[in-house]
Amino acid sequence: MKTLFDTKELLNEFDINLIGIDEAGRGALAGPMMMAACKLNKKLDGLCDSKKLSEKKREELYEIIIKNSNYLILAFSSEQIDTLGLSTCLKTGLKLIKKHFKAENNFLYDGNTNLGINGIKTQIKADTSILQVSAASILAKVSKDKVMNFLAKDFPCYEFEKNKAYGTKAHKEVIAKFGICKLHRKSFKLL
């Protein structure tokens, strides 16, 4: 029986029972952090780390993934992140993901810690090498971007549709000039 630690074998073999997990918006200055978990029904071509794909390609793959998988997308608001803390939100997300999917599945989270949640393995940069984690990465990123595009209409000066709430120079300049809005994470260093 292969384990999740047999990474080279996982790269060459599709595991129908593997749930890939990733998040997007973890380091954003505003808006939600999205966590996604994905169990693919079949091997899909073109999947890789969402950060390496164009926005158009991510959106195309998003549609393919949701039609060919069992998935879960969770959102943690900036208020939840400020109140509970990022680690607690991540831990809660991992627990909800485990509860959503059956226990006989294997869980692989992109990163270096499972935050103490038993049964969840981790691998740094898994989103670049494991299809299910790549799929989760795409689901989380596209979901985060859609939310920020929607919220940008109510907060036009912050240009969330462009910066997706990350700490770009232009975003920080707007914060310095106009202050923060209700979407900003007050527990983060914003300037």
Curated annotation (Swiss-Prot):
GO biological process per UniProt: DNA replication, removal of RNA primer; mismatch repair
Tell me which residues make up the RNase H type-2 domain: 16-191
Query: Which residues participate in a divalent metal cation binding?
Result: D22, E23, D110
- Where's it found, cell-wise? Cytoplasm
According to its UniProt record, this protein's enzyme class is: hydrolase
What's this protein's name? Ribonuclease HII
Q: Name one GO molecular function term.
A: RNA binding
Which family is this sequence assigned to?
Belongs to the RNase HII family.
Protein purpose:
Endonuclease that specifically degrades the RNA of RNA-DNA hybrids.
Matching entries from PROSITE patterns are given as: RNASE_H_2
Question: Does the keyword Metal-binding belong to this entry?
Answer: yes
For this protein, the record's PANTHER family field holds: RIBONUCLEASE (PTHR10954:SF23), RIBONUCLEASE H2 SUBUNIT A (PTHR10954)
Question: What organism does the record attribute this protein to?
Answer: Campylobacter jejuni subsp. doylei (strain ATCC BAA-1458 / RM4099 / 269.97)
Please provide, in alphabetical order, the Gene Ontology terms of the cellular component aspect for this entry: cytoplasm; ribonuclease H2 complex
* The EC number(s) this enzyme carries: 3.1.26.4
Q: Which CDD domains match?
A: RNase_HII_bacteria_HII_like
Keywords of this entry: Cytoplasm, Endonuclease, Hydrolase, Manganese, Metal-binding, Nuclease
What does the note accompanying the cofactor annotation read? Answer: Manganese or magnesium. Binds 1 divalent metal ion per monomer in the absence of substrate. May bind a second metal ion after substrate binding.
Q: What is the organism lineage in this UniProt record? A: Bacteria, Pseudomonadati, Campylobacterota, Epsilonproteobacteria, Campylobacterales
* Entry-linked SUPFAM superfamilies: Ribonuclease H-like
Q: Which cofactor is recorded for it?
A: Mn(2+); Mg(2+)
